[in-house]
From Swiss-Prot:
Protein name: Placenta-specific protein 9
Keywords: Secreted, Signal
PANTHER family: PLACENTA-SPECIFIC PROTEIN 9 (PTHR37355:SF1)
Location(s) in or outside the cell: Secreted
GO cellular component, one term: extracellular region
Signal sequence range: 1-22
UniProt gene name: PLAC9
Pfam families named in the record: PLAC9
Domain of life: Eukaryota
InterPro entries: PLAC9
Presence of keyword Signal: yes
Family the UniProt entry places it in: Belongs to the PLAC9 family.
């Protein structure tokens, strides 16, 4: 069982590096049903993890876009606010003082 786990770990590392993009998918020998069941479960878990990773990446991209949009709105609102008692005096000369 240990060599199988080592082999699967090696394949996972190669897959993560993109080395197996053109290679054929791994198909274990069907001699031992316990090994094939474990391998099938492992492959199912890997597929599910790939789906979850893709969903997380899409969610992060979406949230990043939303945050940028909200920050833009806040900046626009900040420029349109009337000056209050604690607001800095406007820089009429543009010299920063």
């Amino acid at each position: 069982m240990r060599p199988l786990l080592c082999a699967l770990t090696g394949l996972a590392l190669l897959r993560a590096a993109g080395s197996l993009a053109a290679a054929e998918p791994f198909s274990p020998p069907r001699g031992d049903s316990a090994q094939s069941t474990a391998c099938d479960r492992h492959m199912a878990v890997q597929r599910r993890l790939d789906v979850m990773e893709e969903m997380v990446e899409k969610t992060v991209d979406h949230l990043g876009t939303e945050v940028k949009g909200l920050l833009g709105l806040l900046e626009e609102l900040a420029w349109n606010l009337p000056p209050g008692p604690f607001s800095p005096a406007p820089d009429l000369l543009g010299d920063g003082f």
